[in-house]
Amino acid sequence: MLASAPVRYTYNFALYVATPELVNSNLQQLVAAAADLCRKPWRHAVLPLDDAQRCDDCNLRLEVRQADGERYPAADLEIEIYRSGDDLNLTLAWYHDQQRPLLWQGSHPVWMEPESGLRCERPVDGAPLEALARRLRALLVPLD
């Protein structure tokens, strides 16, 4: 082979899809990065709420900090990731305000009243949560 001949590399990027095996090792970093992207300018830390660390069955708390590093607990979220049949579902709820609507994200977003479970309108500040739920679901559902 000549020194000037181009060398071609073939990468199988499918190996790097967020499969359960890959995500198990860094689920908290994945969730925090997605939250940082979808809920700017806030920064997020992720804490497990239970012992489960499987990407398809866990409860997490997102702790929010403002850009200056000051904690902002009013924006903290609880995220539940769970499998129902073959589908991956997420629920997102404000951690410190149990009266606010919660978001269920399966194949589409549904906002619900926490007391009754009845559908309701998306809150004014709900769009970033929908974006976060879509992004997380896309990252965690393996490609066919």
Could you tell me what each predicted segment is?
Residues L2-E78:
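Negatively charged, low-complexity tracts enriched in Asp/Glu with abundant Ser/Thr
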